[in-house]
Amino acid sequence: MSRYRGPRMKMIRRPGTLPGLTSKTPGTKVGSSDRSTSSKKISQYRIRLEEKQKLRLHYGLTERQLLKYVFTARGAKGSTGQLLLQLLEMRLDNTIFRLGIVPTIPAARQLVNHRHVSINEHIIDIPSYNCKPGDVITINNREKCRLVDRRDMNSLQKPEIPNHLTFDSKEFLGSVQQIIDRDWIDLKINELLVVEYYSRRV
């Protein structure tokens, strides 16, 4: 399954707010939720599937990419669900998003793909790069990033930077202090349902 590139508002109507995909929130038609819940009982499979889709859309992953992260989390010591979220949160594109430099993860991915991002003074053009404690992130094309910031986030309240990151807005420099804590992940998700979904399929 490829990465979704269609209208973002259309895709968040069912899963709800996905801050990584879009800063907008879905509207709800009067009576629509009542009809959907009362017409038929939602199966456990569908609940797990929708939670998996929420995770995939938020971080902008293909099905194959998400499955790879699930396998990696399974092979590590600790809670598979929490490790899965930490792996996704420490991606470079998500880290740039969480620093508040750009309003969405797709915008962060574009910066990385266009080679505007350096880590420890080396240009990195891989959005999935796994950021580690001690990494220093700089934006090479500072003027472009300021324009993106001014255009897309001027009317928005910038999110609080999580405790594992620091950001110097004057130098446009971010640093990774530690692995993110579960409490600082801003996506409302039940990661155990995602783990259960894959445990029944692979």
Swiss-Prot record:
| A single cellular component GO annotation | small ribosomal subunit
- Location of the protein in the cell: Plastid
Biased-composition ranges, Low complexity, are 29-41
What's a single GO MF annotation on this record? rRNA binding
The UniProt regions of compositional bias labelled Basic residues, in chain numbering, are 1-13
CDD domains xref list: S4
GO terms under biological process:
ribosomal small subunit biogenesis; translation
Q: Where is the S4 RNA-binding domain?
A: 90-153
Q: Where is this region: Disordered?
A: 1-41
The job of this chain, per UniProt, is described as: One of the primary rRNA binding proteins, it binds directly to 16S rRNA where it nucleates assembly of the body of the 30S subunit.
Describe the family membership recorded for this protein in Swiss-Prot or TrEMBL. Belongs to the universal ribosomal protein uS4 family.
How the protein assembles, per its UniProt entry? Answer: Part of the 30S ribosomal subunit. Contacts protein S5. The interaction surface between S4 and S5 is involved in control of translational fidelity.
The name of this protein is Small ribosomal subunit protein uS4c
Whose protein is this, by species? Aneura mirabilis
Its taxonomic placement starts with: Eukaryota, Viridiplantae, Streptophyta, Embryophyta, Marchantiophyta
